[in-house]
Swiss-Prot record:
[4Fe-4S] cluster 1 binds at residues 12, 49, 83. It comes from Histophilus somni (strain 2336). The lineage of its organism: Bacteria, Pseudomonadati, Pseudomonadota, Gammaproteobacteria, Pasteurellales. The gene is miaB. Its EC number is 2.8.4.3. This is tRNA-2-methylthio-N(6)-dimethylallyladenosine synthase. GO terms for molecular function: 4 iron, 4 sulfur cluster binding; metal ion binding; N6-isopentenyladenosine methylthiotransferase activity.
Amino acid sequence: MTQKLHIKTWGCQMNEYDSSKMADLLLNTHGLELTDVPEEADVLLLNTCSIREKAQEKVFHQLGRWKELKKQNPSLVIGVGGCVASQEGEHIRSRAPYVDIVFGPQTLHRLPEMINQIRGGKSAVVDVSFPEIEKFDRLPEPRAEGPTAFVSIMEGCNKYCSFCVVPYTRGEEVSRPVDDVLFEIAQLAEQGVREVNLLGQNVNAYRGPTHDGGICSFAELLRLVASIDGIDRLRFTTSHPIEFTDDIIDVYADTPELVSFLHLPVQSGSDRVLNLMKRNHTALEYKSIIRKLKKVRPNIQISSDFIVGFPGETDQDFEDTMNLIAQVNFDMSFSFIYSARPGTPAADMPDDVTEEEKKQRLYLLQQRINNQAAQFSRAMLGTEQRVLVEGPSKKDIMELTGRTETNRIVNFAGTPNMIGKFVDIKITDVYTNSLRGEVVRTEDEMGLRIVQSPQVVINRTRKEDELGVGHYQG
């Protein structure tokens, strides 16, 4: 009888990526098939996030539900991973002793051995260590699910912003070797992936080792990925302004596959608050990056992260943030009310902004950005937009849906052979959360750039050393 795996994932795209790798890994090693129904599962995994308020309590609340399943099925294996697991470690088992496995983001590749230990009679396994890049060497080959894919290029962060737990939960910055990244992306391209989103807590800090002992910069990696035939749309997230260097901006000038959309977190428009946050840049320096980008990509659209109500934030500080939002003209944002994260420097600061003030500021900020986004959408009316077709529309199964390079959903009448390909759409209607249009050009008529086939990259990168690690032979 086939055994089942259920994974519940909270948090960022990196967590989503990690969960997909866990599923592939345990399918390969234990034949565990994914199920959406926890009651059917033989293994339950909770991949946690510690960014939001009361993250720990949310974890234990979920585990309380799973406790009942464990009572009904004592052989059920329960594991907790992700950033809360990394933070809490053994404490998770002291509050929830029915949890069998606690693992961190850097030890998920050891799950097969951990499960075997539990099934072999061991009472519990806790491993929240930071074995650097080892996990990528032990994960299965990538498996495409549709025309878009996420690829992790690095882990961790060295910036130690005063409000952030990432350096403590995912460790310091470690970059994957460039050959490993290219090999994974070429394999995905062979399976029909057309858009790749490069992932990391701070992707523009990427410094990947090369086969000859050199270092590949993030700008160089972008060009290498874009040169793989089939990868005709390239994104990355998330970046830090202090490492958004001119060589990255140059890639926007000469690499058409890199989308005209950038997520660049700023958090605040007040230099005083930015200093308290230990962001190590000013609002003016942030605007300088945007100005340089718009010089080479006039139509580029920018999204960002904002924290409102940071300790000590005054009305003037918030007004500075609102001014920055207007000046940059952000298209979208991920914006949140500040809440202290245990163990961070900001947690020791007096949280002196009232809850009512925080809510009001968040409302005003989101309203401003939503209005700006609506203006961008209305400006698309009558224009042609290149869309990557993802599949049937959720609104009408007789239609297709896809996304523009600025991540707007477009619904249109099309044929099944368009799925997984690009089409140019003339926008005829603009709605609150989507666009509608008509096909004016199919992929065969576009003349997309061809540099090197995925198979060429695969053949070139499948040079393994004595540890079984491939090396890019450029």
